[in-house]
Amino acid sequence: MSKVRIYEYAKANNVQSKQLIESLKSMGVEVSNHMSAIDEETLNKAKQAGKPAAAKGQGSTSNQKQNSQNQRSNQGQKQRPQNNQQNQGQKQRPQNNQQSQSQGQTKRPSQASNNQSGAAKSQAGKPNQNRGGNRPGGQGRPGSNNRRPGNNQNRRNHGNRGGKRRPQSKVNHQQMPLPEKITISGSHTVSELAAKLHREASELIKKLIGLGVMATINQELDKDTIELLAADYGVEVEEEVIVDELDIELYDREDKEEELKERPPVVTIMGHVDHGKTTLLDSIRNTKVTAGEAGGITQHIGAYQIEHSGKKITFLDTPGHAAFTTMRARGAQVTDITILVVAADDGVMPQTKEAISHAKAAEVPIIVAVNKIDKETASPDRVMQELTEFELVPEAWGGDTIFVNVSALTGEGIDELIEMILLVAEVEEFKANPDKLATGTVVEAQLDKGRGPVATLLVQSGTLNVGDAVVVGSTFGRVRALVNDVGRRVKTAGPSAPVEITGLNEVPQAGDRFQAFEDEKKARQLGEGLMARYREQNLTASSKVSLDDLFNQIQQGDVKDINVIIKADVQGSVEAMKGSLEKIDVAGVKVNIIHTGAGAITESDIILASASNAIVIGFNVRPDVNAKRVAEAENVDIRLHRVIYNAIDEIEQAMKGALDPEFEEKVIGQVEVRTTFKVSKVGTIAGSYVTEGKITRNSSVRLIRDGIVIYEGELNALKRYKDDAKEVQAGYECGITLDKFNDIKEGDMIEAYVMEEVKRA
């Protein structure tokens, strides 16, 4: 049976600890003090055994109280005339004045004797003991001083504090039972939790001490501690869900199944440069747009619709992968289907691999369009073979990826491609509710001189009407005009329809969500709140995953897997590093390789890393100038290595939280080799121009050719004209020789850097 401390049992059962201890000792139970732990059955027996003694004690106590009250009342009757003499400012009866003087003089010795006897010790020794007239039998008399704040009523209660106030406080606790459930949001202080549980804070502090937690009344308690305390009282804890009133998604109601209707699919075309993406788009548009529309003035708004066999398809004309990734980075899932364009004569190229990585990261179906099959050098089978390496296996070979051979120039295969798009859309069952306020995403936005802010919107659900109040990202306004993809004004736009709107107060960003409202006042209020939040967010840098704080984010539950982009000088190194990283599994956190490639780290790699919250690992390669600039702006972590085991060990140690302080490389300058001179006994002298920063005599250098590190070491000599130089600033020419290396060519880049010791966060 569970044991309970004596003082806790006494408090819960409204008995005195002293009585319980005496009863337990009389029963032969060894008890040291009130903190001793005894089983409840023994305490119940001790409580029953102690009842007669307690009753007797209460009787004697009541007799003593009665005697003391009688003595006070006698003294009050004898000494009451004295009050009239002291309260001279009040009305007095003349016949009592003389009596009060004589009686006051005659009764003082008896009063002194009563004070010494101890019948009224709390009142006798004070000079103003008789000023108050609130004693028993003395209320309502003319001489009583009821208006004085510190009268004898308070003094009497103060004297009886031990006998009256404690039982009264216990009664109050019994009147406030424990709640069945409490609601919390975040952490609470001990006093706040005590108020919710209808208990004293001191009681909670004692329980916390029992749990090994030393807490004060104002100390914050976390959720786990609150749940432990509540469970001890048998109270259920419910966590309050904090609703963000500025979240646009809250204003989009859920659709019922019977409200959903079929909508056109939204298609994005991606692929390598010069593989015919734009030509394919133009071919689809020219063959499928009706003659009447084709004859009119077509306004390019970044998206357009075609109709085939009575069904519509929406195409997004996004310029390259950057816009696609930027929109996805902003949380916009716009695309339903991705068409991967691959030239039959070129095969899989670097940007093709990037497009595959982007499409897979967005988790959308991929249809491969093998373009340029009209060329003599076309080899569609080679394209299929190369794409199997990226898990894109043709249906003819037992896979699930649709391959279509097309020619954008001749129009061959265009109809089949469109039919395949409609087939995938039918299988995926793209649906939306057209009978509600519109929601969707910004495709493009710009500031027009004549019309002001102009935004191209893709309606994803509901119907947008002219005159609707809309909130677009952190901007707001009323729709003044709707223009469709062929430049005609329309009054409404349904699901999957691209339209251009005017009437916003500012230019939104691509990828922003929009929501239509019936109440313009509500839209304005929400838009202003979002604008204020957007400005605050711009002041704080966005949080990206980096190896320095990776372990902390894992501990906090912010990171469940690590997205990694691998770039190396050769494909063999890429495969080796990929295989080693995929085997790492620390603390249940998995390494997820989202993109690999051979060659220098480019701007598109950084954009993909930013969108996917990934870390870029470079092996024997360097980022180009644009990649460095974007990485710095987007706070993308780039890790460069020359030894493959160092890269693997660094990630593994970061996941374990055991990274040591490191030396961080700081690039101080870029130098371009413009000419070379070969001198006997000296070697090759590089006639160079400092394009950025500076180069110093004691700095380390690396020679980069076409993004590949050729040499890494020290300077042998740095000269300006014929003189040795300690450093050369940007905009000046200099002569450079490298230590034990002479294979320098025109166009090479020399990167100067120093190593600075830093401590990891």
UniProtKB/Swiss-Prot annotation:
Compositional bias annotation for Basic residues: 155-168
Cytoplasm keyword on record: yes
Region (G2): 296-300
InterPro entries for the chain: EF-G-like_DII, IF2_II, IF2_N, P-loop_NTPase, Small_GTP-bd, T_Tr_GTP-bd_dom, TF_IF2_bacterial-like, TIF_IF2
Amino acid composition bias (Low complexity), ranges on this chain: 45-105, 142-154
HAMAP family: IF_2_B (MF_00100_B)
Protein name, entry field: Translation initiation factor IF-2
Organism: Shouchella clausii (strain KSM-K16) (Alkalihalobacillus clausii)
Lineage: Bacteria, Bacillati, Bacillota, Bacilli, Bacillales
